């Protein structure tokens, strides 16, 4: 569905630089604490305030950085990530960190001395691994910004390192392709214990309304795993009136406004749902919303729908399911009492490979009325 734009490429690199330093204040609600360290950091680390204080020249990019952090599952409260960002623009280092599989932050991430370097080799996951010649400019520009900022900080960092015995410094963590890691490939493999329980989530549009539900796909729109996402719409082209079509919360939880077109709601049990291609977002970060609460409209202009990059052919919402910050394969999960089967590849609408089951009856892609969570 979406490809990372050239601007997004540069901003993904800047993300690693921009989140340097800082200890996040721990003020998470009981619900968020139960959902894991990743979500605590998502709410507690204020990117906008951090950039205003520590990197004012990057402050104008705070929304894009939040978007890409939410899009890719990158933790925000990291340190020593500037070096990783510069290394990421070289082919040799990109081969080291190219793995699509990350490991979710563990409880040790709560200790600031360690949590700030956890992303040292991972802040580049949003960077495309296949680059064309035309992509060199944004990558080199981002690298230049990283190097300039590193020179500015070099003296102070060197002094700090001299005060820390070498044996106590955290090692640079490198993830080889196909091994371990912090990401989508860790979630939803056969034998997984966690499946979104029946009754937790409803369709992300108002109860009683009928929206078109398309085939399952990955968050990027290509490949077949994890197919975490569904596109839903009421129809209409660019410029159509979408003000009466409301995207609604799939379940109660804490609201995160990543950008003007992208939001996330953190639910119980480590689950969260994301909503992209939006306009008129109704809530700010930290708000508590109930299931079925209207949160936004599908964007009716391509510029707004793609406020942080990607592709879209018309007004719709791109809905995704996450578990502990990683996109989660929908096969076997429940939505409004329907059990989802998704065994093909992205956007496959063949009814033998993508269908929803309820009360013993299978239903293909098409229009669905939202009955609520069951």
UniProtKB/Swiss-Prot annotation:
EC main group: hydrolase
Catalytic activity: Cleavage of N-acetylmuramoyl-|-Ala, and of the insulin B chain at 23-Gly-|-Phe-24 > 18-Val-|-Cys(SO3H)
Region: Disordered, residue numbers: 128-187
Signal peptide coordinates: 1-24
Matching InterPro entries: Dup_hybrid_motif, Pept_M23A_Blytic
Main location: secreted
An individual GO BP term: proteolysis
EC number: 3.4.24.32
Ranges of Basic residues composition bias in the record: 148-164
S-S bonds: 261-307, 351-364
Name of this protein: Beta-lytic metalloendopeptidase
Organism of this sequence: Achromobacter lyticus
